[in-house]
Amino acid sequence: MHVVILGSAAGGGVPQWNCRCSICSLAWAGDSRVRPRTQSSIAVSPDGERWLLLNASPDIRQQIQANPQMHPREGLRHSPIHAVLLTNGDVDHVAGLLTLREGQPFTLYATPGILASVSDNRVFDVMAADVVKRQTIALNETFEPVPGLSVTLFSVPGKVPLWLEDASMEIGAETETTVGTMIEAGGKRLAYIPGCARVTEDLKARIAGADALLFDGTVLEDDDMIRAGVGTKTGWRMGHIQMNGETGSIASLADIEIGRRVFVHINNTNPVLIEDSYERASVEARGWTVAHDGLTLDL
């Protein structure tokens, strides 16, 4: 199984377009300690030829250009991207669908709830129905979006997208609006969970034994954005677990066997983005890799 992390940042990327927090300021200045990062997306292939795109970032055209595996290869129109799978309806995961509207056939997969958030917004009708097939997938149903890749979706604690929030919103609920994915090929297993509000025993049992885990790395501490002075929301309020602390992802997942542990979907205010920082060293010392754009895994 071949895995490419096309975009490793959370919504807005690094640096964010209007942000001068300490981390974004380093990125704007071209400081080599903070790599620029695009918004959350990965691609997976069983053979290096046919690819499944997981989440369609607003930066997808830039991501395709930066990764030769994703380039058109034949004829006047072509793409090695055969299918797209959404793990939630967040803007940073669906807006890139508008870029994929240029008459290229593929199948869009998501749970009924996630797909409804796309179908109910007519702007996505630019993806012609006779070109882009929309396929609903039930939780815990195994399907094959690309020959040789078996995928199963499962609920994880989360919340509805920001643009669908209302007074009835529940943070940490396990529904079909935020899902994890287990991808299998050639006897290898990859768990991809870019958004998760907390780690449950069911989640640990689901991903135990995976050869690699790509997990929500939005915030180091629950109050990262508040500390940075650029926001008032906590990680929990946004539906994202913190890395540190007794109930954080590092401690919560420490007792299960997993091959490689990689943080993705990293917010611009997370200090692990600074490569020579104490925070980065601390995370790496506990067995985790901080993803960057273009990071590849061969399982």
UniProtKB/Swiss-Prot annotation:
Summarize the protein's role: May be involved in the transport of PQQ or its precursor to the periplasm.
* HAMAP family with a match to the protein in the record: PQQ_syn_PqqB
Task: Show the InterPro entries listed in the entry.
Answer: Metallo-B-lactamas (IPR001279), PQQ_synth_PqqB (IPR011842), RibonucZ/Hydroxyglut_hydro (IPR036866)
Organism per entry: Methylorubrum extorquens (strain ATCC 14718 / DSM 1338 / JCM 2805 / NCIMB 9133 / AM1) (Methylobacterium extorquens)
Q: NCBIfam families of this UniProt entry?
A: PQQ_syn_pqqB
Could you tell me which Pfam families the record lists for this protein?
A: Lactamase_B_2
Q: Which gene underlies this protein? A: pqqB
The organism's taxonomy opens as:
Bacteria, Pseudomonadati, Pseudomonadota, Alphaproteobacteria, Hyphomicrobiales
Q: What is this protein called?
A: Coenzyme PQQ synthesis protein B
User: Which keywords annotate this record?
Assistant: PQQ biosynthesis, Transport
| Metabolic or biological pathway, per its Swiss-Prot or TrEMBL entry | Cofactor biosynthesis; pyrroloquinoline quinone biosynthesis
